[in-house]
Regions:
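Flexible, compositionally biased loop and terminal segments
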Residues: 1-217
Length: 217
């Protein structure tokens, strides 16, 4: 059975920009172009959900100019998106600018009844914080068991995570969907995120289809 839910750690946007003689912050707009290509091909190949790591809570320590560029790209995407995907976000939005937080709310509402693939965006997100929040809610409701605990995670509306792909050459999960990754396959690519395209998706999915998943057995 093919992958139904893939997580992408979109690493390498800043390095790509520098390698092409641009300021680091310009890499994020090019990264969005790559995301459109990757998501489109995933949808064509029958993937039901794509989760992408757009901004970690730790990334908030980056220079303000770089953060402003990320916020601008995300806000523009939210305000202009008119495709078929169902857009969802997970993360802490309380510390975000009101206008950016509102754009997140708007795009989720606008696409709620769409029939396409889920495009789930982790933004100002950290898996450890998400797990702790889910544990607290589950405990408060007296239902701290696996099958009930999971419904309090930010990803509870999505299929189980099958595969995590990280671009950019690093080999770590960086606090991305740690609970959901328990039995997920992992793939690490040297290619920088803005260079990702449809052909890479085909290679990723073809590789996944050859793997034998044991789910801890």
């Amino acid at each position: 059975m093919g992958a139904k839910h893939i997580g992408f750690i979109m690493d390498g946007n800043g390095r790509w920009a520098v390698a092409h003689g641009m300021p680091r912050q310009e890499g994020y707009a090019h990264g969005l172009v790559a995301l459109y290509k990757v998501a489109k091909r995933c949808s064509e190949r029958g993937v039901e959900a794509v989760s992408v790591y757009a901004l970690s809570t730790e990334n908030l320590n980056r220079p303000q100019g770089e953060l402003d560029s990320i916020f601008k790209v995300v806000e523009k995407f939210n305000l202009t998106y008119d495709g078929e995907y169902k857009i969802s976000y997970m993360g802490d939005f309380n510390s975000l600018d009101d206008k950016l937080a509102y754009s997140i709310e708007q795009v989720e509402e606008k696409t709620r009844d769409n029939k396409g693939m889920w495009l789930n965006i982790a933004f100002n997100y950290g898996a450890k914080a998400d797990i702790l929040h889910a544990a607290k809610v589950a405990y408060d409701h007296g239902e701290f068991l696996d099958d009930t605990f999971e419904k309090h995670l930010s990803s509870s509306h999505l299929p189980p995570l099958d595969l995590i792909v990280r671009s950019g050459g690093e080999m770590r999960l960086s606090n991305f969907m740690l609970y959901e990754a328990a039995y997920a396959e992992l793939m690490f690519l040297d290619k920088l995120w803005p260079d990702m395209d449809e052909g890479d998706v085909d290679k990723i999915l073809d590789d996944f289809d050859k793997r034998v998943r044991k789910f801890g057995k």
